[in-house]
């Protein structure tokens, strides 16, 4: 087994969403690294609809059929609302991300400040989706190492 204070998670892009949800259910996870995640489903729905040049009026229909097909209401899939005050988070994002727009990163910043969520943030300059780890591998690794060492004692 593992000591309860030695468990950390790392989630990238859409993979960060189940990491956040899992950490919410497992309070022994002390440190969560989130790279290029969506913050709220309604935001990503708007982003994707706009990406294809469709009107936002399609949003409710997309949500309805998503729920009908999966049995899960996509509106309930809001990672920001699953963050806890008992865990530590590190958020990173590319400032030029066109896949998961940087407004998700800023949403996390604002939400975490308003809700006293223990978190650190790094916006990787001149970086697109999940680019930070590739454009700045040494800095990315150093930040990750420090974050996990500081929070998994």
Regions found by a protein language model. Name each.
Residues 83-85, 90-93, 97:
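Short beta-strand/loop motif that positions the catalytic acidic residue
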Residues 106-153:
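C-terminal catalytic histidine-bearing segment of alpha/beta-hydrolase fold enzymes
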Residues 21-72:
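Hydrolase active-site cap/lid region
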Residues 9-11, 35, 92:
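Short beta-strand immediately N-terminal to the catalytic nucleophile in serine-hydrolase-like folds
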Residues 2-12:
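Alpha/beta-hydrolase fold nucleophile elbow
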Residues 11-15, 19:
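Gly/Ala-rich beta-loop-alpha elbow adjacent to hydrolase catalytic centers
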Residues 4, 29-30, 119:
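Core-facing hydrophobic residues within beta-strands of well-ordered domains
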Residues 98-104:
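Conserved alpha/beta-hydrolase "acid-adjacent" motif
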